[in-house]
Amino acid sequence: ACQAAVVPIVAMLTVENVFVKPGSKKEAERAIGVHAQLAREGGGSSDFSTLLAIYQLATEGGSTREWCNDNCIHWRAIKTAQSICEQLGAILDRQDVRVDEKDEKIVSSDSMSQRARQALCYGLFGNVARTVPGRRSYRTMDGHGTVAYIHPSSVLFGADSTPEWVVYHELVDTAKTYMRTLCPVKYAWIKDLLPRLHNVDVYRLSECSAKRPRKDSEAEPSSPPPSPKR
């Protein structure tokens, strides 16, 4: 399977501020350069593979703190991700799910494996977007049809060509709506998943079924007014 790739990605998505953004101009320029190199290490085609490359490079040996300092990565974010990986690994062990790391090493490869990207489709099928023909914007497929743009921090930002279909981790609303942390996907992977978006019970997912708004026909009949006293 692809757990060896997906588990670290999930862990990295749960932490904030992975990238250090120095205040001085000189250090900021250096950070941009090293972050671009890290994106290339992950294949340069997916923000998820960049996160995986960062995790693997930071934890594969030596001093994690020193590596983070050299590459403008927050050390505490990596340590937190490591802890989450251990917790997720323990859960997989209890479920008797084996992780075959040799099949899912991403560093120095051209891209994430197809299995890992397909797994992201299944996990994030509610966060699918399709490009708007003739424009550099997308529309989300969640039923709202929100117009969204690739976030400037993405490795896909400013690319000569944009993928037709992507999955994203989150939407960020500023002057525009941006998709942050993206991965190109194929329509064949998601065509059977898209209809599920119309069958999702958000109240059940959020454990709020008891508070579900009732239709007028389901409303309890109002009690008759008390009889006036004589």
Regions found by a protein language model. Give the residues of each.
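Second RecA-like catalytic domain
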Residues: 1-215
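Acidic, low-complexity intrinsically disordered tails
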Residues: 212-230
